[in-house]
Amino acid sequence: MFQDKHKVTVENENIEDINYDDKPDLVGISVTVDVYPRAKEIAKRFRVKGIKVVAGGIHVTTAYHTIPDNIFDSLCIGSAEGTWPDIVSDMENNTLKPLYRCQNKIDGDKIASPAYDAISHSEKYLFCNIIHTSRGCPFKCDFCYNSSPDRTYSVRPVDDVINEIKAAHSKHIMIIDDNFLVNPARMREFLKAIKPLHLKWHCAISINIT
């Protein structure tokens, strides 16, 4: 999702202090419900300096209607792959909108891999090598965030997933799909492809496996 003309830095407050002395053109914050109060504080620190702040993530996607208009400059609803290029373009043209919604389902081969190379001081991180083979879930259980109308289900090509696993250079992979066993035929294809790598891995599946 990044272009060569853009310099991107990823900061994680769990590892290091946020550099508020930096003066980026745009700040993006991924928000879950547990970090929402802290996300508001971070946004305020940057916005008082005139820096635009965009919030996205699962909490914004599922509960954007609960977020006051004066907390962030813009909200990103749904998959960032379908909204981030427009957000950056509008920011550059000084036409940033208050809300961006991914209008189309993102095909699995368009799901972006984590930009680990953009993390500053990466030597401080212990990567657990998490992998998405899909995003979302075809079921709409009432208790789950996947019941949101802005949540869609997309499946990545098996070859694409295997290439990311190989790039991780790890013998222990954590698959964090919301529901790994949706398509048994695809699962068998994946198992056949991953077996020669001799990995330890785990995942979550739905109760209908029983």
Q: Which residues does each predicted region cover?
A:
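Radical SAM [4Fe-4S] cluster-binding motif and immediate context
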Residues: A112-T210
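Glycine-rich beta-alpha loop elements in corrinoid/cobalamin-binding modules
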Residues: F2-K110
